[in-house]
Structure formats: C-alpha cells, structure tokens
Amino acid sequence: MINQHMVRTYRGFTLDPFQQEAVAYIDKNQSVLVAAPTGVGKTLVADYVIEKIYNEGGRVVYTAPIKALSNQKFKEFKAHVGEEAVGILTGDVVINPDAPILIMTTEIFRNMLQESPERVGDVRYVIFDEIHYIDDPQRGSVWEESLIFMPNTMRFLGLSATIPNVDQLANWIEDIQGQAVQIVTASERVVPLRHALFEQSLGITTMGRIKKKHRRYRGIPRHVLLSEDLVKPTTHLDLIDKIKDGYLPCLFFTFSRRKCESNALELGEYHDFLNGEQKRQVKEIIEKITDRYPDLKSERWPSLRRLLMKGIAYHHAGMLPVLKDIVEELFTHRLISVLYCTETFAVGLNFPCKTVCFDSSTKWDGVSFRPISNREYFQMAGRAGRRGIDTEGFVFTIVDLSYFDPSEFPSMKEQEIEPLQSQFALTYNSILNLIKNYEEEDIYRILGQNFATYQAFAEQEAVLTEMEMIQEELEKYSAHLQKKSGPDIFGKLIRRKLQIEAQLHNEYNKRTKRRLKKDIRGINRRLEGILHKNLPHVDQRTLRRERRIYRRLLARYERLIVREGELDPHEKYIQEFLDKKALLEALGYLEDDELTAAGELASQIHGHELLVTEMFMEGMFHDYSVPELNAICVSIGYEPRKNEIRIKHKIDMSGILRIWHFITKMEQRFIGYPTAQFNDHVAALAYRWTNGESFASLLEDAAIDEGDLVFAFRRGIDLLRQLRNATIEDPVLNGKLRECIAKMDRDEVSIWL
C-alpha cells in the first residue's frame, strides 16, 4: 500500500505505484517478489536496491540469467559508482571479485553458496533478475538451488515477467526460507500494446478476418493455392512497407539465424532509413568500437557495415561479440530503424522500440517445430512501446494463409501466460556438495524443499479433495442403483474395487500388481453386468441416466488415482539421489559418506564433472601440452550444431574416449542414461588458436558460425578456470592452466568490459 512516507522519485524518475510499493518494502529490509509485464521498469527497483545497500556500506549481489545481461549491468554500475566499487563473476570473466557490488550469473551465485558460502556471508541483498527462468528446462534448477541454500539472513529481490502463480512461488520461498516474502504486481503497462496479424492481401488485420478468408481455401493443397495465385506468400518486405511510415524503430523477431541475415540483406536492397547526419553518427560509433580490434576480420562485417549505414541490422548468437556490441550500441542511440533478431535479444537486455514484428508464430525447439508460448510471445512483444516517447506499442505477426493453423498462434492475452513449473534436477556436483556439507536426514529434508515437491503437494491436496467428493457421489449413486438392481452385491463390489485400486497404487511387486489388475477386471465385468441388466419394474430412462453419471464419475475417479500416484516427486528425487550416490561410490568419489580426493575435485567442477575428474585422476591434464589441453577442454561438453563437420586433428584422444565410454557405460548401469559429452569437432581450431593463429585464419576452416566458435572457446576458458581454482595445491598444473587461459583469452575471444 502507498503512504506519504514512500519514496516517490528516483534518479529523476517519478516512480509508478508498483515501484513505490517495492521500494517501501526494501526500505523495511524485506524480501520482495515483483511480477510485472516486460518493459514496465522492474529494473529500476533493482538499481534502487544496489545503490541503497552500497551507500549504506553493505554488499549486494545482482544475478542474471545470461552473461550479456551481466556484462550490461556491470558497465552501467561501473559508470554510475566507479569501477572500484563493482565486480563481475561469470565463469569466464572475473573482475574485482571482492567488490561491494557484485554482478554475476545465477550459476556462479549457486556455486558460491555450495562451495564457499563465506564469500557471500556478508551480502545483505541478492537480486534475481528474470527469476521466471526457474521454469527453464536446462537451467531452472540453478534458481531453485540458490533459493534453497541462500541463508535466511540474506534478503532478496526477485524480478519476474507476469506469471499467474506468483503467489505459489512466493509461498514456496517463504516455506523454505522462513522469512516473509512481499508480493508486488503490476498488470497495466505504462505504454499499452496493440496486437494484430498481418497478411498481404488483408493488411493489418484480426484473427477473425484471417479465419474467414482461410475458410474459402479449406481443403485446397498448398501447391495449388500458390501455383494458381489464389494465395500469395506474405513476406517481411510486405510488412515493412506497411509500417515504414510511423511505426519504426522495429524489432523483427525471426527464429532462424540465416533468415535474420537474409531478410536484413534483402531489406537493404530497397530501403535506406538514415539521413546524412545519422550516417555520420553511425560511422563514428563503429570506429570507436572497432579501434579495439585493429585486425577485425569477419565474413559478415563488410555487408553488415553497409546495412548499418542504412539503419538496418541483424543480431544473433552466431555473430562475433564485437559485431553484436556495435549493433546494440547503434540501436541504443536510435540509429537502427529495423533490427532482425532471434529471441535471445529479448532476454533482460533493455532495448525498447515502437514496434515488434514476428515473421512466424512457430519455432524450432531443437526437437520439432512448435507454437511459441504466451510467455515467450510477451517476453519479445513487451519490447514494444517506449516510455515517454510512444502512446502505444504495436505488435504484428505475419500470417501465411497457405500454412495457416489458428492453434499455432499464442492467445496474445497477458492473463493467459503459462504458470511456472519446477525444473529441479540433481547433478553429481550438487550431490557431492550435499554429502560434504549436510547430514543424511538434512539431505532428505533439502531434497523435499524443491519447488516441484511444493507444487506436487499443493496439487495432491486438490486431487485428494476431489477424490473424496467423487467417492461420496459414487456411494450415493451406488445406493440408488443398488436399490433398483436388487441385492447388496453392487455396493460391495464398488467398495472392493476402490480398496484394490488404493492397494494397487502403493504396490511395487510386479506379480502382485498383475493379480490386482486381474481382480479389478473381474469386478468391472460383474459391475457392467449389473448396469446392463434390464429391470422391468424400474424407469429405464432414469436408470440409464444414472448409469451414465456413475460411469463418468468412476472414470474420473480412476484418472485421479493415476494422477495422485504421479504426484510424489520427493520419492523420485530421493531415488535419483541414491542412484547417483551409488554411482559416485562405485567410481571411488565417496567412501563411508566422505568425499575422497576424486570427490573433492568433482565437487568443484560444474558440468561433465565425472569425465573431467577421471581424466585428472589418470594424469591427463599433467601429460598433455598447453595447446592440446585447450583443444580437449573445448571438446568437453561441446554440442555440435546440426550437420556440423568435424575438423580433423592429430591429438591422441584415445585415452579420453576410453574414459568417456567407461563413464557412459557406468551411467547406463546406475541411472539408465548418459550425461557425459565429448565432441572434438573444433579441437583443431582451439589448438591452432593457442599457438597464435589469427581468428580470421581459423574461420577459413571453421564449419560453424564465428560467434559459436567464440562461445566454444569461452566455455573452454570457464572449465580451465574451474580446474585452476580446484588445483591450487598443485603449482605445476596450476601454472600450466594459467598459461592455457592466457593463450585462449585474447583478441576476438576476449570480452571488453
């Protein structure tokens, strides 16, 4: 609630009601969860916390889901409070780690809580930006672990996009932390969004009009529609032509890197959005950034530079970081009118525009094409509408009538955004750190504190309540049918059936389960016989209606029994813990619930820790040369892109492959699936880079995008840093690892902050 004592302005901005409310709770030293639409100013609350704690002489941690957002925040606060006060930790970058303001990825914060909690023991506040990432299938567990292991003396600020189950998330955190969590929500956007579809013959239109036109062509094959010009494909050029006067700047989300580039190049053939003065500014900014890279060579750069001089650009993860920096800087200065980008551009980074366009409502998720979710849609659409500039933001989605399927479009209603779901997972590293720091009963308690278990218990209560209600209804109809059907046999059969189903739910012996299922089938046959019996003294219409109701109730009850049986994640996590613990014992990482030397090393490695530890224990990191070691570290966990060609090399990796096959076999035996990955597709390039070759010469042989190669090298640097930190007591290896890092972290691969 707002009162007269609330802070109403900050950094010259008049705070919105939700910002005032959040700041008021922070001033009372309370934890706050803010859920509000993308682009309404949640970040201003984070800035207030950071500045407040710093001015009071305390320490504060800001965590982000992606390194680009961490880097952006580091630059902002370095400029605001001075570089001595701000540090950054992102795995591959470490600057001023003891600073009072620490910017880091959420993974680093989780790792510090598990391995060296004393390093963050004096932190007063931690900020979880984009906390809805708890729902991310690959990384969501990191947010859960951070919240579980965070000391309850530490306060937190969670910033989330709009989520329907924010109360459930806050209640779970209260439950595990033992501290109150204040919820602040905002549903209205300062700059409202207008959503529409676009089809070249209809123009900017509605779903209703699209459906009406599509009905005319129902049943006609696509090739006929196109060959006879019944339907003309709608392109990005059609949409840009429609919005170029009055709707720019525009972010054009395209779920393909190749299409990002080809669309931008195609637009550049027809349009130039900049005047002479703007072109001069573009040239000045480009020169300022490229001065840091005198030998910058990229196949993309000449054509991208020509596009930038026209106010057109593209942005995706396959680009060199310096090229992305140039595009971002120009967009910030309002010198880009149309930017084709992939969805990563929408994560956290503050780049508002007037209009957001989608070239499709479906995306490839690594397995298949699927419709984008409402949350994904609004994460991107929320960039439309610039505060203080636009009265409304516009969101347009291209429709191809020859492919049209209304079920593949998000609802475009913010109130229908999907709820968060837990993605909790147990890694070998987490298990080793749990065993290292907690007693057995505390470990089992912690395993029950995850968000998945909390959500399951909540659903379980609802399921059991509904089962009780249905059971009462079943007994009522059972009594009715029993009176009409004759003896008491019907009611007895029902009671017996429910007893067996409850027993079946808790039975694990396969033979007993088969017998119980056979008993249920026998009872079902007898019940059906009674239900189908024609009774001349009974009104047959009423009896048929009651039988139908009874069958529906019984079917629903049986579905609920199955669902209730699925809702026991605590047992699932305990079993997963025991299976992985048994594997760690078999590998010699644990003895009598104590970590061995191998276990200690694995507890400090995050990702592919079994492969790394086994290699270390066999002396491989000591034996390989610096270039070979870099090639190997880049290969550990490397995931080649589809159809990527492996570049041949002469490094003997037979020992590593032997270990990898051994670990894969052990994982299949103990947990039923492998996790270790080793792919040497770019090992040769890492070897040559370490020996001093230029990045341009590597790209002549590279079978992947230049940005992907930089990412692979930086992942290798991250692993090398972890190994360096874990082997401080081995000065020879430690020195070699430092040399490895120095030779990898140079020129185009370095990050400038």
Where are these regions (language model features)?
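Conserved C-terminal RecA-like helicase domain
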Residues: 61-63, 71, 78-88, 253, ...
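SF2 helicase catalytic motif II
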Residues: 106-109, 116-157
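Conserved nucleic-acid-binding Ia/Ib motif block in the N-terminal RecA-like helicase ATPase lobe
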Residues: 58-111, 171
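Non-catalytic terminal extensions of ATP-dependent helicases
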Residues: 313, 318, 332-336, 424-753
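Conserved segment of the helicase C-terminal RecA-like domain
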Residues: 351, 355-365, 370-411
